Amino acid sequence: MPDSALPPCSILLLAGGRGQRMGGRDKGLIEWQGLPLIAHLHRLVRPLTDDLIVSCNRNQERYAAYADRVVSDDSRDFPGPLAGIRAGLAVARHPWLLVLPCDAPRIDRALLETLLQAAGRTPARPWMLRCGGQWEPLFSLIPTHLAEEIEHAWRQGDRSPRHVLLPLGAEAIELAAGDPRLANLNTPELLANHRELK
């Protein structure tokens, strides 16, 4: 059951990319430390929500084992993570949508709780992690009431989550440059380098 001390949130795991850096392989299903990457994220976030959403454009039946709902965006050309965020916002059942990439298995519960606790301070604005001054929009917490504004930006042709969220008054959780919890294991080399790390 979700922690009642934290604001109720839906959680979206983004697994919809082409996997170009992985030679076209579906990143979320690649194994790391004996489990698919998506399984590590599922194990971490499952206690935080009763509305776990996975956005993917292929292998939906396999991802269904790790989600309450599987969604896909409405384009066939892999238009990027904002498409998955739109799909998640469209079905989210709670006032907040916590967005995470499927290829970041080193993120920890403490950091997610910090992000969720921040929501109570400014409930109308999105929150993002900012690592060494660099915004990380795929580690974000978005009020679902902003879905219409995000949809408007999409219709105007904006495909960048950062460009869309910043004008909505995004707040930052500051992290030091190189924080290993945000490591995206999105190439074979990175996957190998982090394979033995706990």
From Swiss-Prot:
Binding sites annotated in the UniProt record for GTP: L14, A15, G16, K27, D73, D103
GO biological process, one term: bis(molybdopterin guanine dinucleotide)molybdenum biosynthetic process
Record localization: Cytoplasm
InterPro entries per the UniProt record, alphabetical: MobA-like_NTP_Trfase, Molybde_CF_guanTrfase, Nucleotide-diphossugar_trans
EC class: transferase
Keyword list, A-Z: Cytoplasm, GTP-binding, Magnesium, Metal-binding, Molybdenum cofactor biosynthesis, Nucleotide-binding, Transferase
Binding site residues for Mg(2+): D103
Enzyme nomenclature, EC number: 2.7.7.77
Keyword DNA-binding assigned: no
GO cellular component, one term: cytoplasm
Catalysis performed (reactions): Mo-molybdopterin + GTP + H(+) = Mo-molybdopterin guanine dinucleotide + diphosphate
GO MF entry, a single one: nucleotidyltransferase activity
Cofactor: Mg(2+)
Major localisation: cytoplasm
UniProt free text on domains: The N-terminal domain determines nucleotide recognition and specific binding, while the C-terminal domain determines the specific binding to the target protein.
Family statement: Belongs to the MobA family.
Subunit structure, interactors included: Monomer.
Record-linked HAMAP family: MobA
Function: Transfers a GMP moiety from GTP to Mo-molybdopterin (Mo-MPT) cofactor (Moco or molybdenum cofactor) to form Mo-molybdopterin guanine dinucleotide (Mo-MGD) cofactor.
Name of protein: Molybdenum cofactor guanylyltransferase
Organism the protein comes from: Pseudomonas aeruginosa (strain ATCC 15692 / DSM 22644 / CIP 104116 / JCM 14847 / LMG 12228 / 1C / PRS 101 / PAO1)
Gene name per UniProt: mobA
